[in-house]
Amino acid sequence: TEIGAVRSPEDVWFDEYGNLVWTVKDPDDGIPDDKKRIIYFDGHTDTVRALRDQWHQKTDGSIDAYDGVLKLNGLAHDFLRGELGYLPPDDEWDNLIFGRGSADQLGGVISQIIATKIALELVKEGALKGTIIRAYATTAEEDNDGAGPMYLMNKVLPGSGPELVPDVVILSEGTGDAGKGALGIYRGQRGRMQIEVTVT
């Protein structure tokens, strides 16, 4: 509530798995919750291993996994371009955030917080009319292949009312598209299948 991303402290909590959950809606729009559209935001709060020594070595000491950019002069542009696929123009580097999870994936979680704040600021203009935003900052995605969201799919949503089941899902995972620049929006799903094969 301090930054205005929810109406009240009751609108934000940790679920039993440890996912941070917050909701926003317009309680005065005259539409019952079970008739509203549900927009689901999801972003994860964990990151992969830092590999601090490797990054420090491969960037000639110009980047530290925890401290960010240590020196812009002599930054290993070729290495970074190879790792990231895209580098912004040099005159934009002062506006970048470097550090653990800044791109994967805390920047996305921050965008969810800002989106709900803006939606609440625009409630008088109808931004939330007939809509509930359910936002999640989930855990255990990097190291457990999506265990935080799977908790929702397996434990929260089955048998729940329509006020919980999403009509649309927005994943705030940074996608990027080196051909288009630093940002890109992807629609769809990469897909996944788990199968067990028994050979006799």
Which residues are covered by each model-predicted region?
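Acidic/His- and Gly-rich active-site-bordering loop/insert found
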Residues: 1-102, 122-131
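Sequence-level motif detector for i,i+2 pairs with an aromatic at +2
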Residues: 17, 36, 165, 192-194
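Hydrophobic residues positioned within well-ordered beta-strands of beta-sheet architectures
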Residues: 20, 133-135, 195
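Conserved beta-strand segments that form the floor/walls of ligand-binding pockets within enzyme
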Residues: 40, 134, 198
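Intrinsic structural disorder/low-complexity segments
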Residues: 47, 115, 190-192
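Acidic/histidine-rich catalytic neighborhood of metal-dependent amide-processing enzymes
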Residues: 91-188
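Eukaryotic endomembrane system proteins
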Residues: 188-198
